[in-house]
Amino acid sequence: MICGTDEAGRGPIAGPVVAAAVILDPDNPIEGLNDSKKLSEKKREKLSLEIKEKALYWAIAQSDPDEIEAINILWASMKAMQRAVEALPVKPDMVLVDGNRVPELKVPAKAIVGGDASEQCIAAASILAKVERDRQMLKWHELYPQYEFDKHKAYGTPKHLELLEKHGPCPIHRKGFNPVKRLLANL
């Protein structure tokens, strides 16, 4: 069994990094899988439901902003992917990882640059991770509406930076990330 894993949320300046691990059913293909960044939100939502229904196994895990601050975004991403793979109810024979590094795993793993566009199982993981992270950011928006997380999902857009400057950071902002770090240095 081949597992694909990927993360979503390395670039934003707030919120968790979320990872998913997916083992697809070769006898039950899913049409339209691709890198989550190349799909519309509506398409990702639709595919996310189909992946959860048709995949043999899937799991989602994350690293929260405090962990990101403690160990940096790269290692937090690796930890989230490791947790997602370990949360599967079975041990895969091989794990394909999007990117150029592999997390510490108890099974063989291979890094594939651009794997979210070339490997169906990684694309599926990419979609699950992105949809879950976006949902979490909508929940954070309910708690902190002044940052408009519902619009930019915590990426450093001009509007988000403007709101960050106006209101200061909230508890889920990544204080070690440059726009937030600069703001805190000037307080």
UniProtKB/Swiss-Prot annotation:
Cellular component terms per the entry's GO annotation: cytoplasm; ribonuclease H2 complex
Pfam families referenced in this protein's UniProt entry, alphabetically: RNase_HII
GO BP term, pick one: DNA replication, removal of RNA primer
Amino acids binding a divalent metal cation: 6-7, 98
GO molecular function: manganese ion binding; RNA binding; RNA-DNA hybrid ribonuclease activity
Keyword Metal-binding included in the entry's annotation: yes
Cofactor binding note from Swiss-Prot or TrEMBL: Manganese or magnesium. Binds 1 divalent metal ion per monomer in the absence of substrate. May bind a second metal ion after substrate binding.
PANTHER family from the UniProt entry: RIBONUCLEASE H2 SUBUNIT A (PTHR10954), RIBONUCLEASE HII (PTHR10954:SF18)
Entry similarity comment: Belongs to the RNase HII family.
Job description of the protein: Endonuclease that specifically degrades the RNA of RNA-DNA hybrids.
Name the record gives this protein: Ribonuclease HII
Organism: Idiomarina loihiensis (strain ATCC BAA-735 / DSM 15497 / L2-TR)
